[in-house]
Amino acid sequence: MKTFNIKSPDQAIHQALIDRINNLAKPEGSLGMLEELALQIGLIQQTLSPRLRNPHNIIFAADHGIADEGVSFSPKEVTWQVINNFLGGGAGINFLCRQHGFELVLVDGGIDFDFPEGLDIIDRKVRKGTRNYLYEAALTGEEMEQAVTAGAEVVSDCHHRGCNVVSFGEMGVANTSTSSMWMSFLTGIDLKDCVGAGSGLDSEGVRHKYNILKQAKENYKGNGSTEDVITYFGGLEMLMAVGGMLQAAELGMLIIVDGFIMTNCLLAASQFYPEVCDYAVFGHCGDESGHARLLEYMKAKPLLNLGLRLGEGSGAVCSYPIIVSAVSMINEMHTFAQAAVTKYF
């Protein structure tokens, strides 16, 4: 797999950031997670005056062979149909990106559809969907490496355009199934606790989904390594997000993590480079079964809990105003001396 150069942020500035935050005209700790965020972002950017520039939400999209087993509420063609809605500006993530000032980047990583030329979508298609991992490996090692590299290159391009904060979204029918497989293998959590309704399965549908995934897990004869698991089960959009997150960390960008699927991508990325988590903020706890358990496993503190289960980066983008507030706090609040206020705690 592509190698990355990721280091934890230098801690030399840590105490100066703490002093700066504690000398703002407020009781120490009274702005809670805003203070934690300001510290984290200051460390990432190595400055007492951090700035957020040109935020991007990157949506990687691809199809999954396991969708042929009826594990999703939606048929496979919904993947490309939703992408068309993104392109038309009418999806949930479109209005959120407009509202919060994000540039939306769409990437075809492996959709089982041929889009006409000239659309505002980046073509990094590795193949038309993954193979059905109920019966065989979803991807080859070479295809996995292509996907990780493609995701990294998309993020590098965003960085070259002045972006220093990035969120990731996804679109791919049946990708909650693949995420459940990643979660169970990479955490050791029982598969039943990792499987949920996805885009809208009823209880019978969830039962069928679990039974299919349980059989797929039993059929897997790999070595159980992170690289083997994410190759065997795919999917292409998730692997691109892994590469994108690792590249963002290498470039010192702030990563806003979305829901169940993107949290699994960060989990996988952290198995290779644990330091990637130093650059990540968890936007929200989603409504997909397994997400809260996964966040707990990763000792994550999500900023929001709104019952979202849309994906697309929606929860990450919704959380952005809180991150902006943290940066505004450290840059705009007066110190006790500037405010001529006696330090009252």
From Swiss-Prot:
Keyword Ligase: no
Enzyme Commission no: 2.4.2.21
Entry-linked Pfam families: DBI_PRT
Keyword Transferase in record: yes
Catalytic reactions on record: 5,6-dimethylbenzimidazole + nicotinate beta-D-ribonucleotide = alpha-ribazole 5'-phosphate + nicotinate + H(+)
InterPro entries listed in its UniProt record: Nict_dMeBzImd_PRibTrfase, Nict_dMeBzImd_PRibTrfase_bact, Nict_dMeBzImd_PRibTrfase_N, Nict_dMeBzImd_PRibTrfase_sf
GO biological process, one term: cobalamin biosynthetic process
Pathway membership, UniProt: Nucleoside biosynthesis; alpha-ribazole biosynthesis; alpha-ribazole from 5,6-dimethylbenzimidazole: step 1/2
Active site annotation, chain numbering: E312 (proton acceptor)
EC class: transferase
GO MF term set: nicotinate-nucleotide-dimethylbenzimidazole phosphoribosyltransferase activity
Keywords noted in UniProt: Cobalamin biosynthesis, Glycosyltransferase, Transferase
PANTHER family linked: NICOTINATE-NUCLEOTIDE--DIMETHYLBENZIMIDAZOLE PHOSPHORIBOSYLTRANSFERASE
Biological function: Catalyzes the synthesis of alpha-ribazole-5'-phosphate from nicotinate mononucleotide (NAMN) and 5,6-dimethylbenzimidazole (DMB).
Cited NCBIfam families: cobT_DBIPRT (TIGR03160), PRK00105.1 (NF000996)
UniProt similarity note: Belongs to the CobT family.
Protein name according to UniProt: Nicotinate-nucleotide--dimethylbenzimidazole phosphoribosyltransferase
Taxonomic source organism: Porphyromonas gingivalis (strain ATCC BAA-308 / W83)
